[in-house]
């Protein structure tokens, strides 16, 4: 049984929604067990609430050490100035012991993201790949396998690097049906590859 972790950070719920769609897609693949977890919040609780952060996220909080228990990990993060959110950065910065032991070497990884206005969504994914490459992950983009990526009739997220959503400057825009379809495709695509490599 190939074990996949969908690991995310979400402040306002956009990445949480994409994470659910990613997991839904991954669960379509036979022989795969999917778990959704989130990284710890680093903001003080009162500051998080004052900023309008979503406090009712059901996914349990992960620890860095448990990453070694999975065959594949799909990371989700909002964009912060063109890079991953600080909460995800802080979590990954605690994986030095896993790097030293080679515990993540050869595992499958993929990345999805959210941006306010689209600025930095691709760079957020590809800059996250740098950290994953240092661990020796096999990085899986989605290419143009999702037909929704060819639709230019509306504003939407989605890249050949991974699923994305555009939240709007005030965070009011929720992931569209097309963005969720791309996320489901990513989950299924990564799960198929992980299942093959885990045999």
UniProtKB/Swiss-Prot annotation:
UniProt keywords (A-Z) are: Flavoprotein, FMN, NAD, NADP, Nucleotide-binding, Oxidoreductase
The question of whether Oxidoreductase is a record keyword is answered with yes
Pfam families per the UniProt record, alphabetical: FMN_red (PF03358)
Q: Which residues form the Flavodoxin-like domain?
A: 4-190
Similarity comment: Belongs to the WrbA family.
HAMAP family for the chain: NQOR
Its protein name is NAD(P)H dehydrogenase (quinone)
What organism is this sequence from? Yersinia enterocolitica serotype O:8 / biotype 1B (strain NCTC 13174 / 8081)
């Amino acid at each position: 049984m190939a074990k996949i972790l969908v690991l995310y950070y979400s402040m306002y719920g956009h990445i949480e929604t994409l994470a659910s769609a990613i997991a839904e897609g991954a669960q379509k693949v036979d022989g795969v067990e999917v778990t959704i977890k989130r990284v710890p919040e680093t903001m003080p609780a009162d500051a998080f609430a004052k900023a309008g952060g979503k406090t009712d996220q059901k996914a349990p909080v992960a620890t860095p050490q448990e990453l070694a228990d999975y065959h594949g990990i799909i990371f989700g993060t909002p964009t912060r100035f063109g890079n991953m959110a600080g909460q995800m950065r802080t979590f990954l910065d605690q994986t030095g012991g896993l790097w030293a032991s080679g515990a993540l070497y050869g595992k499958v990884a993929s990345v999805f993201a959210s941006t306010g206005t689209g600025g930095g969504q691709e760079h957020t994914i590809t800059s996250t790949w740098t950290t994953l490459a240092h661990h020796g992950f096999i990085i899986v983009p989605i290419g143009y396998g999702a037909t929704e990526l060819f639709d230019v009739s509306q504003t939407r997220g989605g890249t050949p690097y991974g699923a994305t959503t555009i939240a709007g400057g005030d965070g009011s825009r929720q992931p569209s049906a097309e963005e969720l379809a791309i996320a489901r495709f990513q989950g299924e695509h990564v799960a198929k590859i992980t299942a093959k490599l885990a045999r």
